[in-house]
């Protein structure tokens, strides 16, 4: 492998880079923005492909781009490339960055006015070959296969090297006949017309029979069948033109002395600054620009106040983990703790990557250690794609190693790098919401919640018996036993033996789908389907909750300690893991019985506080729709009122079916539900569903206007944001693929609503936490739009009033926030209070 920046040896092989094609290809292949919202996917993709090639061919490199002036092809055939989509708005800006990268690397950059990059590359390739050099052409353009020879090969962007033998074996055409092949088949991407009606198979057959297009035309009267001959005769002009357009010129008047060609010394400082500016941390590492290890000044423990900490855990769950190592960094000095657990008491704060985890472990050990600054939280606010320290380190330059001191140094460096990038709104979110919230979550995780283990074990046994009964019924209907958990066996039973019509196929294997959605669509087709769905529901609850939950009770505390993930979702919502409490069914009887197993300690009660229809209230505020705001201000039922508007009735005449339809539309609008999906949900035809959605927007006209405005802002800025400035980048709003673009549109207008609701919940938690202390109450769980607390039995009424007051006044909206509060011995009882 050639050292990346070794310029000593004279070049024996030249690397020619099809710069324009490579840039255009990566522009659409990736989706990447900086934390400032600046699209950089083309620069990154180009750099990665180029870097891969430079590791093998680092000495003589020429990168060729199309010149702005029209080429002879444009002059010869005005339709040439005319059918291509217009140049994307951001392409020229990123192309300028690509060219700057090439210059910083010290590579020769070439543009020849009046000629296309293809012809410049072709001329250079053949000239280098004549001078006895090996040539590699880095491109994804198959046109270059015509240049292949013993000394000329094509290097694809994925690293595959293509030789004449490869082309012959894969396409059945030698390189010298490639132009003929392309002239017959045409190329829509380059508007090479070809012969209409001739595809690759026919072209191969013609070339196998006649050898070349030239010989084919000499013997045109002998071509069979007659219909094929007539096609060629009707498109002779196109065929001749296609030969000219497809052939890469190798005779341009270019003077290049390859033997004297040497790369300039790269501008390493400029390159480092360039990659840092674009936040290509992984490329800094791969280009070797992070520098060698600087001597670290070792200083004694404890560190000074404000130091950043790094630590290693034996496992990711801090309540269960052993603290293996603890270190701190301050102004480049490293402080190492010899007894990590004992050293926790010397710290004033947990500051650094995953600060919350260290705070949880410290609380377990009886040490009150508040988490403060965390570069991961800063990076997450800059771009919610930043969810893990490993990825953040790679993106912004560094490596999240298995060394506590290195982690501390990395935390210090990245925090100092990222913190100044926070805009005014994001800075407020960081200082007033996310940073103080990490302290709240640390205490919630350390506190945990008590479980009624015997109840869970009894329920598990009950489910096991019911699953056995369902299994027996399924076997009876199938006519024989089989493995219900085997998708292949289930597929055979349903579709081969019982003759059901499949609904969809799996993407990877193309097998008939037995997934949940497919089976739900088959409900009613056969009694066995309903039994299988029931069996699966019980099996999932048993394996996900009933059996694992008792094993997750901590032996020291006797409680369950879930982890709350602050940087896991694109909308800002919290998620939980180990276990994930978000997926416990809310409305099913079994889900409710699982909630009954979450209980209070003796002398305490659980308090459940749930925001009522918070996302619809947020939508009313963001859209400013007067009808929507009036419903909430007057305390009316939003679904009944929506139904009244949609059906043109007095609210008193709205029946349950109408209300259900309105409720489905109300929440469906938030998630971009299509008329097709609505028709399935409500069991109505497509036209009726379409009319429902239209009547909804007629009832709430400013909602539609807000959606359109949000999408337009997303396209213009590259991101959408919540009421408080939390961002989500949506580059796919500009996608040329309709399904991708429509999915991005749904995400784009849902995020401000869902994200604002998440922000309101977080603000409420931060405000509530210090006010619970005088009552002796504790926050335990945050699930969906709900908080669960543990309160002393004799302070329950005070706690109910306090929680309701704080949550409903988290932030002033144009409509009131409403919170339903209840208490009980267990979670279910509290919800039903």
Swiss-Prot record:
One of its GO terms (molecular function) is DNA binding. It catalyses: DNA(n) + a 2'-deoxyribonucleoside 5'-triphosphate = DNA(n+1) + diphosphate. InterPro entries: 5-3_exonucl_a-hlix_arch_N, 5-3_exonuclease, 5-3_exonuclease_C_sf, DNA-dir_DNA_pol_A_CS, DNA-dir_DNA_pol_A_palm_dom, DNA/RNA_pol_sf, DNA_polI_H3TH, DNA_polymerase_1. It is an enzyme of class 2 (transferase). Residues 412-833 are annotated as: Polymerase. GO terms for biological process: DNA-templated DNA replication; double-strand break repair. Disulfide bonds: none annotated. Belongs to the DNA polymerase type-A family. In addition to polymerase activity, this DNA polymerase exhibits 5'-3' exonuclease activity. Unlikely to have 3'-5' exonuclease activity due to absence of a 3'-5' exonuclease domain. This is DNA polymerase I, thermostable. It comes from Thermus filiformis. The gene is polA.
């Amino acid at each position: 492998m050639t050292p990346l920046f070794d310029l000593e040896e004279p070049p024996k092989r030249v690397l020619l880079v099809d710069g324009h094609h490579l840039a255009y290809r990566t522009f659409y292949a990736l989706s990447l923005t900086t934390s400032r919202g600046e699209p950089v996917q083309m620069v990154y993709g180009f750099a990665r492909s180029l870097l891969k090639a430079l590791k093998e061919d680092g000495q003589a490199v020429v990168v060729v781009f199309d010149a702005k002036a029209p080429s002879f092809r444009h002059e010869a055939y005005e339709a040439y490339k005319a059918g291509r989509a217009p140049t994307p708005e951001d392409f020229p800006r990123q192309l300028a960055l690509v060219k700057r990268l090439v210059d910083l690397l010290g590579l020769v950059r070439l543009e020849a006015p009046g000629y296309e990059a293809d012809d410049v590359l072709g001329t250079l390739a053949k000239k280098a070959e004549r001078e006895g050099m090996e040539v590699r052409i880095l491109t994804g353009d198959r046109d270059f296969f015509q240049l292949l020879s013993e000394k000329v090969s094509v290097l694809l962007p994925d690293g595959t090297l293509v030789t004449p033998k490869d082309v012959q074996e894969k396409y059945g055409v030698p390189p010298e006949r490639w132009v003929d092949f392309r002239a017959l088949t045409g190329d829509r991407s380059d508007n090479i017309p070809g012969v209409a009606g001739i595809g690759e198979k026919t072209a191969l057959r013609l070339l196998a029979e006649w050898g070349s297009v030239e010989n084919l035309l000499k013997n045109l009267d002998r071509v069979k069948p007659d219909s094929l001959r007539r096609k060629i005769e009707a498109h002779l002009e196109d065929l001749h033109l296609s030969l000219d357009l497809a052939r890469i010129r190798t005779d341009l008047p270019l003077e290049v002395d390859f033997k004297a060609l040497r790369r300039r010394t790269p501008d390493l400082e400029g390159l480092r600054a360039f990659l840092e500016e674009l936040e290509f941390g992984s490329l800094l590492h791969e280009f070797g620009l992070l520098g060698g290890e600087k001597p670290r000044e070792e200083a004694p423990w404890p560190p000074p106040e404000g130091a950043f900490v790094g630590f290693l855990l034996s496992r990711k769950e801090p309540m269960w983990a052993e603290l293996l190592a603890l270190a701190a960094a301050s102004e480049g000095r490293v402080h190492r703790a010899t007894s990590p657990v004992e050293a926790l008491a010397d710290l004033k704060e947990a500051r650094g990557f995953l600060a919350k985890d260290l705070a949880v472990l410290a609380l377990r050990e009886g040490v009150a250690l508040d988490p403060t600054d965390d570069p991961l939280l800063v990076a997450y606010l800059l771009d919610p794609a930043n969810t893990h320290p490993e990825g953040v380190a790679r993106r912004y330059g560094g490596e999240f190693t298995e060394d506590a001191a290195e982690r501390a140094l990395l935390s210090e460096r990245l925090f100092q790098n990222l913190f100044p990038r926070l805009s005014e709104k994001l800075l407020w979110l960081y200082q007033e919401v996310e940073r103080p919230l990490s302290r709240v979550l640390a205490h919630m995780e350390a506190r945990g919640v008590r479980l009624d283990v015997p109840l869970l074990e009894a329920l598990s046994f009950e489910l096991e018996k019911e699953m056995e009964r369902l299994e027996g019924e399924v076997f009876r209907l199938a006519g024989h036993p089989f493995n219900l958990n085997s998708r292949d066996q289930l597929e055979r039973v349903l579709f081969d033996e019982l003759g059901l019509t499949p609904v969809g196929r799996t993407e990877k294997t193309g097998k008939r789908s037995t997934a949940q959605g497919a089976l739900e669509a088959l409900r009613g087709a056969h009694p066995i389907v309903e039994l299988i769905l029931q069996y699966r529901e019980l099996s999932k609850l048993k394996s996900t909750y009933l059996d694992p939950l008792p094993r997750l009770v901590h032996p020291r505390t006797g409680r369950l300690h879930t982890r709350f993930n602050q940087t896991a979702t694109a909308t800002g919502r919290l998620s939980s893991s180990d276990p994930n409490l978000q997926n416990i069914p809310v409305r099913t009887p079994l889900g409710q019985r699982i909630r009954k197993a979450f209980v209070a300690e003796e002398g305490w009660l659980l308090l459940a506080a749930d925001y009522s229809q918070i996302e619809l209230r947020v939508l009313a505020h963001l859209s400013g729709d007067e009808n929507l705001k009036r419903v909430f201000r007057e305390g009316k039922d939003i679904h009944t009122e929506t139904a009244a508007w949609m059906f043109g009735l007095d609210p008193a005449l709205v029946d349950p079916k109408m209300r259900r339809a309105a409720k489905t539309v109300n929440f469906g609008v938030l998630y971009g539900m299509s008329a097709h999906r609505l028709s399935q949900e409500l069991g109505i035809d497509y036209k009726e569903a379409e009319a429902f959605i239209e009547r909804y927007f007629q009832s709430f006209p400013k909602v539609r206007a807000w959606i359109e405005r949000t999408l337009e802002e997303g396209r213009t800025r590259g991101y959408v944001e919540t009421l408080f400035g939390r961002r989500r980048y949506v580059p796919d709003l500009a996608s040329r693929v309709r399904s991708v673009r429509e999915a991005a549109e749904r995400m784009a207008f849902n995020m401000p609503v869902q994200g604002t609701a998440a922000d309101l919940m977080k603000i409420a938690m931060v405000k509530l936490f210090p006010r619970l202390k005088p009552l002796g109450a504790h926050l335990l769980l945050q699930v969906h739009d709900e908080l669960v607390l543990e309160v002393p039995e004799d302070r329950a009424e005070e706690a109910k009033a306090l929680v309701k007051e704080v949550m409903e006044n988290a932030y002033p909206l144009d409509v009131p926030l409403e919170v339903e509060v209840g208490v009980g011995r267990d979670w279910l009882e509290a919800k039903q209070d």
